[in-house]
């Protein structure tokens, strides 16, 4: 008798989105977002993962209680997928054209994903198109770029601002960092 591991009606327990940064056809970096019940917008040990290279081309940050660590994996409560803004860190040299695209989009219908560039005042609807930029100056740190997950279709005409300041102190340092 053969067995089948498929269980009818077994609910999906998490959703995933992977963003990738490319220069031309070359993939440079990716960052992952997971949404699962029981997680928070802060650090969830065993789920959130800091990037081994804090100067990597593409990182995200915690939405709550950010302590200045760039993440390769950012895991959040499943309900957050309906309305959350996540700081994104892009580290690129001036004059180097790059694009950010959605690679994996394992998220239920109706969720819209936008990349905000608050310096240029743009909202790129990543469900429909890639974000492309040739920076005039080197990019680094947080505060300019954000990923928006929402159930609404946003317009670049809307006055959306995510001017955030992050302040944190690492345990082994004698100073506070403000970004």
What are these regions (language model features)?
Residues 1-179:
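Compositionally biased Ser/Thr/Gly- and acidic/asparagine-rich
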């Amino acid at each position: 008798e053969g067995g089948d591991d498929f269980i009818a009606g077994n609910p999906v327990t998490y959703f995933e989105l992977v963003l990738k940064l490319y220069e031309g056809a070359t993939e440079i970096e990716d960052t992952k977002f997971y949404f699962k019940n029981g997680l928070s917008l802060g650090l969830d040990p065993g789920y959130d993962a800091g990037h081994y290279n804090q100067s990597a081309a593409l990182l995200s940050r915690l939405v709550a209680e950010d302590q200045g660590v760039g993440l390769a994996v950012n895991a959040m409560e499943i309900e957050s997928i309906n309305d959350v803004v996540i700081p994104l860190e892009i580290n690129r040299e001036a004059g180097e054209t790059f694009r950010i695209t959605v690679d994996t989009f394992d998220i239920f219908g109706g969720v819209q994903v936008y990349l905000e560039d608050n310096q240029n005042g743009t909202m790129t609807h990543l469900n429909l198109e890639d974000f492309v930029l040739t920076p005039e100056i080197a990019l680094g740190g947080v505060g300019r770029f954000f990923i928006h997950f929402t159930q609404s279709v946003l317009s670049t005409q809307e006055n959306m601002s995510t001017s955030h300041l992050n302040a944190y102190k690492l345990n082994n340092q004698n100073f506070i960092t403000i970004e």
